[in-house]
Regions:
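Conserved beta-sheet core of the metallophosphoesterase superfamily
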Residues: 114-122, 132-134, 139, 144-150, ...
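Short C-terminal domain-edge/linker segments immediately following a structured domain
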Residues: 52-57, 86-90, 128-131, 163-170, ...
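Short charge-dense sequence patches
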Residues: 27-40, 147-157
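Active-site neighborhood of phospho(di)ester-bond hydrolases with catalytic His/Asp-centered motifs
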Residues: 23-25, 54-58, 95-102, 135-136, ...
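Core catalytic region of metal-dependent phosphoesterases/phosphodiesterases
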Residues: 2-8, 12, 17-20, 29-128
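Active-site-proximal loop/helix segment associated with metal-binding centers of metalloenzymes
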Residues: 136-199
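Generic beta-strand structural signal
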Residues: 23, 56, 127-128, 226-227, ...
Length: 266
């Protein structure tokens, strides 16, 4: 039986309404991306405080080998800085909701507790200024990408997470690699870039089942609004700050009065 503390089981399934949130996704923080780290810390200091709540819909980190491995005495200076900045944000009266993604699916309650944040389940319906919004990382709706779905089924499994978190930290990255190798080998066929995107009917069905008016997600790195007869779906931008290539981008979604999303790209 899986430990209830594993991230796959630990996320809150309901939370109080949001009054004025800013939402980000796919920041992919990592030690080898110092410019990205600096940009994120500036965001927490200068942009996020303008809003009542910060919501992260997955992949805040490019990898996360478990709270026990990434926090505490062995924590990197980067992780310490992120925890301190998030804790300062929440201690100043803001709420922070963090959802694990695929890259950081082992992000758990110890991390969010250290930040004063809330770990939330994927997906989760939240009332935003009177509008019912389904928040998700979004990977589960890329249903034509069978290798991705096979990999996701493994690494988000409570049983797999429980077994991996029992291993020494140094062995955990190998387990992710083996899971991806097995998924790729079981589904070796090439698929188009289009088929790696969200399948509208899959997202729409989740929204209907949850009673949500709007879907908001990350994962695909294809920011924009997608409105059709089935669904109103908003895709969050990813972050990429690279001084060498000058390939710099970031962004977020905020809400107008009445819970209408608006996307901001930089």
């Amino acid at each position: 039986m899986a430990d209830m503390k594993v991230p796959a089981l630990a996320g809150l399934k309901s939370v109080p309404p949001l009054t004025n949130p800013i939402v980000i996704s796919d920041v992919h923080l990592a030690p080898n991306r110092p410019a990205l780290m600096t940009a994120f810390l500036k965001f927490l200091e200068r942009i996020a405080p303008r809003y009542a709540e910060l919501v992260v819909t997955g992949d805040l980190f490019d990898y996360w080998l478990g709270d026990d491995a990434m926090l505490g005495p062995d924590a990197s200076a980067d992780v310490d800085a992120i925890v301190s900045s998030l804790r300062l944000y929440t201690s100043n009266g803001h709420r922070t909701l963090i959802m694990p993604g695929l890259h950081d699916c082992l992000l758990g309650r110890d991390f969010t507790d250290a930040c004063g944040a809330e770990l939330v389940a994927d997906p989760i319906v939240i009332n935003v200024m009177g509008t019912s919004v389904l928040f998700s990382h979004g990977a589960q709706w890329c249903t034509k990408d069978e290798a991705l779905q096979a990999y996701r089924a493994v690494v988000t499994s409570p049983q797999w997470q429980s077994s991996v978190l029992r291993l020494p930290a140094g062995e955990r990255a190998k387990m992710f690699g083996e899971a991806w190798k097995a998924a790729s080998e079981s589904h070796p066929e090439e698929i188009s870039d289009k088929d790696r995107d969200i399948v509208e009917s899959a997202a729409a069905e989740s929204a209907r089942a949850a009673g949500a008016q709007i879907v908001l997600h990350g994962h695909t790195h294809r920011p924009g609004a997608h409105v059709n007869a089935m669904i109103e779906r908003w895709t969050l931008p990813d972050w990429n700050i690279d001084p060498e290539t000058q390939h710099n981008k970031s962004g977020w979604i905020t809400f107008l009065e009445g819970g209408r999303p608006q996307i901001q790209l930089f």
